Amino acid sequence: MASSSMASAASGFMVATPNIATSNTAPRTSMLFFSSSKNNTTTNFPRLVVRAAEEAAPPAATATAEGEAPPAKAAKPPPIGPKRGTKVRVLRKESYWYKGVGSVVAVDQDPNTRYPVVVRFNKVNYANVSTNNYALDEVEEVK
């Protein structure tokens, strides 16, 4: 076991905080100092000094040039798949719930997702699971 304790480790810890200036434009500097109290007999103490400076942020542009219009936001694409809560029938033949009806829990709007439609059923399958993901062409809305 190590013979040092947290008290001796904390005895060589010093934090120097910068003086608070009234001006916001002055850069701030912080200093953190660690020293080891193990080798008090030698003059070559191992130590770690960390300095961090925070520069003032450049002022934001407040005025726009004349004739320059703000960029128009792109219109959202229409949502894909059935809406949440819609009753759907499963068309995947290998599914436990084939031709069964369940309700849509969520639809992933990413077009690269293979099975974006999450459907929840009232009955559970052999693994005690009541939800499954399906592709858009594997479900049809029930009216």
Curated annotation (Swiss-Prot):
Coiled coil: none annotated. Residues 1-51 form a transit peptide. GO terms for cellular component: chloroplast thylakoid membrane; photosystem I reaction center. GO terms for biological process: photosynthesis. 2 isoforms exists (ratio 1:1). With or without the N-terminal alanine. Residues 56-75 have a biased composition (Low complexity). Stabilizes the interaction between PsaC and the PSI core, assists the docking of the ferredoxin to PSI and interacts with ferredoxin-NADP oxidoreductase. Belongs to the PsaE family. This is Photosystem I reaction center subunit IV B, chloroplastic. It comes from Nicotiana sylvestris. The gene is PSAEB.
